[in-house]
Amino acid sequence: MKLIGAEPGMKAVMTRNSDHFVSLGGRVAIARRVKAHLLVSIHADAWVKSNVRGSSGFALSQKGATSAAARWLAKNQNESDLIGGVNIATVNKQVATVLVDMTSTWTIGYSLGLGAAVLDELRSINRLHKGKVEQAGFAVLKGQGIPSILVETAFISNPTEEQLLKNANHQQKLAQAILTGIKKQLAADKTLVEQG
């Protein structure tokens, strides 16, 4: 959080500041409330086999985005400013569906680029569990119009990686890698920078 706060034009907002549960939908709601331009969910993975290791990145799948778009449209049809300032309630359903689909397509594409940039940076610190950004229907990634990634820094179920995750120096390296990946994506695709 300190690294991001030191960057001009960037601000980090935590979804929680203590060890308490915040629902996945609650995390997305926080991102919407603060008008987040990006959502980066950072975790440690776990598996039944202790030899599994590596960092991973996830973005929303197209199937998940379509499902989220339908839920979003139903829940937010009376709100404006969620898609380019267009009040969805004032346009016909076909136009609304096209707007939501266009936003979903752009959001997923940006998220995939962001995930790839972050994984490229994490690769220098930890081996990758998979060589590319994977896609799945994680609820925390379903914030309509907010490019989102889920980063699995390592496997806490792997004793070696667990020790690394406890190390403050390693934590700093992970944080710096994630920030550098974010900055590289922002430089490569200035859409979010231009939105202010």
PLM regions: where:
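Exposed acidic/Ser/Thr-rich ligand/metal-binding surfaces
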Residues: K93-T97
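Catalytic-core regions of hydrolytic enzymes
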Residues: M1-N92, S104-A116, L192-Q195
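Active-site-adjacent mobile loop/cap segments within catalytic or ligand-binding domains
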Residues: L38, V48, L99-G196
